[in-house]
Amino acid sequence: MIREYIDRAMDQAKYEILPEDQSYYGEIPACQGVFANCATLEKCRKELEEILEEWLLLRIYKNLSIPEIDGITITIKEASAA
């Protein structure tokens, strides 16, 4: 489910070329704080995906909400005490 979430989020990524240095800037608008800036579009996509994965893991670890993307939700359930 996490892989599918990442794939769908990456489909929503927005990219632009920054006029100051002609580098590529990418972000996923639904995921606040997930952005990357690299010299090439390929590197920007790769870094953006890595940042998204780290962002997801941090939100899961801290039990923070994760926005729904294309009908996919990730919910954290409390572990029961053994």
Name these PLM-found stretches.
Residues 32-43:
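A short, exposed loop/beta-hairpin motif centered on an aromatic-Gly-Thr core
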Residues 16-29:
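Short aromatic-glycine-(Arg/Gly/Cys) micro-motifs in beta-strand/loop hairpins
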Residues 29, 33, 64:
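Flexible, active-site-adjacent loop/turn segments at secondary-structure boundaries
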Residues 1-14, 46-82:
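Short, charged, surface-exposed hinge/linker loops at domain edges
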Residues 11, 24, 34-36:
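Structural detector for hydrophobic anchor residues on beta-strands
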Residues 20, 31, 79-81:
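Generic structural motif
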